[in-house]
Amino acid sequence: MTEQELAISCARGDRTAQRELYDQYGSRILALCRRYAADPADAEDLMQDSFIKIFRVIGRFKWTRPGSLYSWMARITINMAFDSAKRRRSLARQLVDVD
């Protein structure tokens, strides 16, 4: 299945296609998560959260060229990593303010 067909099938809720997408891109997304996460457990959580979001919004994906699916998934993952870091910093500031 091409990446374009894979994205369309995932958008239709095809569980087999979702499994294929995860199997095909999971290790690359996890490697990306490890660059942004504080520790391995955080990287696993980030990857899981990223795939949940990817599957939720994959209907918005617009295929433009080979490799665009991974680029789109990577951008979602990076944005989620930045959002998570912002939340952690905000929480840390709140905890410091309480002291």
Give residue spans per PLM region.
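Structural recognition of an alpha-helix C-terminal capping motif at a helix-to-coil junction
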Residues: D45-I52, R56, G67-N79
